[in-house]
């Protein structure tokens, strides 16, 4: 097999020479369509020399398997052939025993502590059918950051096989609540539910946390004072400040793609209108000006357009306008009401919540209003938020009240095809979630 003639020399060059599209074509992976047959990935134990290396390697693989299997397009497993499996000190296969368990893709690697409290993982991805190395990459990290490193490894595998960016090394901000008055807190966790922390204390009514494009800051609504205010929170320093510039009751804050502006809605004198706040100067610019309710504004990724919902036609519908507020036009045309729009980071879709009769849906449509598709339905579903690669949607799902669960609100994801739904592991009831960009390694 040609696989054994590769050495760990210039893996990036090897990856470029082989090309991504050949592997994708061979495996038949198209994440924009519902895949009926999953790509089978076998992950081999990492070559290690010490107990510390061995345990971190095992922990990383467990996280990688969970990440990959959550996509609905992979069947990833940690298997060993009957005769055992061995790799070189660099993590390269040194026998053909792997062919008995690996069908589509084989992942091998090595882990080595190279300094006090720091390790290096070398990860290799192999195409089983051709016996070729698809990629090789190194990950250097502090031992305490092994989980984030594992998510980055998952991103590397996902990206190499699908040709799309990964979304595993990310965080989710949400509102943690019990359903009782005054029991809402802003919380942040990894996308798989790990490392949950609270940003705000108890007794403060808060809502709609939204990450900045660099994931260093949050904006959210706080109603600790009368009228409510938009709070800008620095996640690195813990410092919070209220945004000024707009009077009245504020709501629905969201960053611009470059992080220089925040969109929000202001309610005053019987109407609600959308403003843009320049974070450097504090200057506010009014973008809508009528007697209706205009809210939930979201920029397009190129910052040239804004989608929002408005009841100016009698019930909530989706509208798009230029970034300066001109050329406002309605894009939704189906039955029912539309709300909570969120523009995909790819620019190709707008996610929304739709109510029709007693039914709630999460769906997508193109920016011109065409191609509407409903992806998820529930007793009450709301607040869609995109993964950074624009292929998965996170939303809130509230279950009907029962004797055992008078209030139950969960975070759920659905892929762009509507075929793969996952319930996230969250320690409390949760709502109003927002997905961060991919974190820096």
From Swiss-Prot:
Superkingdom of source: Bacteria
Subcellular location: Periplasm
Organism this protein belongs to: Anaplasma marginale (strain St. Maries)
Taxonomic placement: Bacteria, Pseudomonadati, Pseudomonadota, Alphaproteobacteria, Rickettsiales
Family in the record: Belongs to the TolB family.
GO cellular component entries: periplasmic space
Protein name as annotated: Tol-Pal system protein TolB
Entries under PANTHER family matching the protein: PROTEIN TOLB, PROTEIN TOLB HOMOLOG
Keyword entries, A-Z: Cell cycle, Cell division, Periplasm, Signal
């Amino acid at each position: 097999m040609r696989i054994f003639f590769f050495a760990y020399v210039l893996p990036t060059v090897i990856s470029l020479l082989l090309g991504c599209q050949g592997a994708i074509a061979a495996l038949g992976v198209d994440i924009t369509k519902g895949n009926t047959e999953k790509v089978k990935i076998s992950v081999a134990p990492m070559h290690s020399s010490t107990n510390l290396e061995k345990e971190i390697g095992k922990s990383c693989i467990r996280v990688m398997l969970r990440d990959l299997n959550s996509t609905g397009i992979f069947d990833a497993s940690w298997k060993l052939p009957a005769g055992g499996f061995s790799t070189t000190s660099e993590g390269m296969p040194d026998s053909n025993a792997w062919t008995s368990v690996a069908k589509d893709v084989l992942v091998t690697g090595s882990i080595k502590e190279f300094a006090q409290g720091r390790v290096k993982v070398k990860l290799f991805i192999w195409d089983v059918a051709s016996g070729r190395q698809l990629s090789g990459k190194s990950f250097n990290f502090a031992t305490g950051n092994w989980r984030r490193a594992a998510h980055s490894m998952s991103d590397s595998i996902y990206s190499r096989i699908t040709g799309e960016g990964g979304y595993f090394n990310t965080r989710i901000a949400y509102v943690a609540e019990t359903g009782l008055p005054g029991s809402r807190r802003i919380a942040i966790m990894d996308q798989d539910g790990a490392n949950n922390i609270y940003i705000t204390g108890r007794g403060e009514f808060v809502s709609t946390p939204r990450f900045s494009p660099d994931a260093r800051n949050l904006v959210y609504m706080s109603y600790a004072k009368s009228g409510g205010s938009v709070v800008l929170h620095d996640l690195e320093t813990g410092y919070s400040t209220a945004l000024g510039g707009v009077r009245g009751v504020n709501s629905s804050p969201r960053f611009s793609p470059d992080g220089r502006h925040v969109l929000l809605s202001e309610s005053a004198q019987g109407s609600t209108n959308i403003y843009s706040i320049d974070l450097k100067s504090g200057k506010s610019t009014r973008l809508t000006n009528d007697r209706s309710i205009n809210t939930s504004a979201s920029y397009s990724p190129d910052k040239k357009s804004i989608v929002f919902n408005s009841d100016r036609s009698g019930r909530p519908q989706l509208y798009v306008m230029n970034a300066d507020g001109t050329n406002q036009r309605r894009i939704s045309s189906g039955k029912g009401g539309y709300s909570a729009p969120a523009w995909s980071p790819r620019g190709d879709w707008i996610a929304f919540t739709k109510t029709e009769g007693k039914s709630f849906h999460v769906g997508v449509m193109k920016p011109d209003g065409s191609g509407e598709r409903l992806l998820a339905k529930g007793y009450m579903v709301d607040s869609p938020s995109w993964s950074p690669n624009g292929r998965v949607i996170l939303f809130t799902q509230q279950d009907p009240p029962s004797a055992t669960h008078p209030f139950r609100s969960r975070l759920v994801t659905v892929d762009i095809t509507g075929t793969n739904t996952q319930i996230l592991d969250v320690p409390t009831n949760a709502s109003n979630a927002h997905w961060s960009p991919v974190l820096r390694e």
